[in-house]
Amino acid sequence: MGHVGAHAEILEGGWAEFYGNLLERCPMGYSVSVGPFVPWRGVEGVGEARCGGCKRGEGLRVSARPLAGMGGVPCRLMRFAMRMDGTLDILRGGEVPTAGALAGLLAAEGQALETLCRAAQRVRMERVGANVYLRGLVEMGNGCRKDCFYCGIRRSNAAVHRYSLPDEEVLAAARFAFRNGYANVAIQAGEDGSSAFAARIERLLYAIAEATRGELGVTLSLGEQRQSTYQRWRDAGASRYLLRLETSSSALYAALHPSDAVHSFEGRRASLRALRDCGYHVGSGVMVGLPGQTLLDLANDLLWLRAADVDMVGLGPYLEHPQTPLWARRGELWPRAERLRVAVAMVAVLRLLMPTINIAATTALQAIVPDGRERAIAAGANVIMPNITPRGRQDDYSLYERKPLAADAAEDSLPSLAARIAALGCRLAVGERGDSLHFALRDSPAGVW
């Protein structure tokens, strides 16, 4: 099985793209390999290889050895396992791998994905503990001035039934959350930049604070606004704000939005900077599996989130909606199971990259498989957002096809949720706010937006 002069090509970050069996590292720490792609038969082989990373080891004698528990596995998987272990070592050391190395982690499947998730869960337990915090999601309205090509409530969708919850229904949902131990609400709506909307949210925030003695945490997800509006809402009691960038690639962003001032990539980034300046716990996130998106794009998304120094992240699989322009490109999409797998890997890698942030197990994961949120929690997520919007309105907040709906009585679902989370070795932290530890530890308003 040995081959003299076999080739090992070193890619970005020192990771080898192997043409053959996986072998031990060269004296400078680079992996080298010999031989063609063949199934591993458990037989040791000897060969010579030149390591292209350190330019040493020409004629180096190396031996091919089976990795523990991988007998009968094709060499390409053993090859990947060694690369993954090296990247995990870099992350555990507190360093930042290259985008190419992170993309390799995002390709993990099967046993490799389980290994990645276990590593992330260990870090999560060590750094932020076993708690999973609740955010009661209130979908306040589905009118939107944006016309994003992927979204079911986009401005041009004449088929959607528009609604706006009365203030009393929003307050009732907040009281419900407070009474039932959620400790937090997340108020979400389509984007409205009017002064009337800004004033309405300000009034609601003061009313929620009065109704809950200022104890209920409030997260807002209301799109791009003026910095003065963000500040008004912060002063009225909102402490967290989620504004998803959706992708850190300006080219991909342009393919997802109309080309106008309302849909500016730089404007989105400027809004995130404004939120930080106003003192919010800043959250962002991305979609996984967009048409034309690559694993390298997603790896760069992870690096952007880290560079931006966000306090919380919500990410999930892109789910197509038939009343959107991107529906025409559904033939280009990864299978839904693949989008789920990569989204779970994204959660795990993000936990390793940013150990102290809050990461949400998003509803979009549940839209693919019933235990989608639980898979994210097993990969390091520590926030879950049950939908407490009045049931009659949830159908109308249709961002994507086959969106899961909450139980008829939201309070009845908490014991079941707690049991499922406990089965993962975690604890549903009823009555606890669960503010981002990352925010508490920050010394300065860092972040490259």
Description of each model-found segment:
Residues R135-V138, A158, A186-A198, L256, ...:
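Glycine-rich, proline-tolerant flexible connector loops at the mouths of alpha/beta enzymes
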Residues R226-W233, P291-L305, A367-A378:
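Catalytic cores of alpha/beta
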Residues R155-L171, A177-L272, H281-V288, D311-G314:
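Core AdoMet radical
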Residues C51, V128-E169:
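Canonical Radical SAM [4Fe-4S] cluster-binding loop centered on the CxxxCxxC motif
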Residues S33, V46-G47, L60-S63:
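Intrinsic disorder
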Residues Y30, C51-C54, C75-Q111, F178, ...:
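Auxiliary Fe-S-binding modules of radical SAM enzymes
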Residues D192-S195, T219-S221, Q225, S271-D297, ...:
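Conserved strand-turn element in the central/C-terminal portion of the radical SAM core barrel
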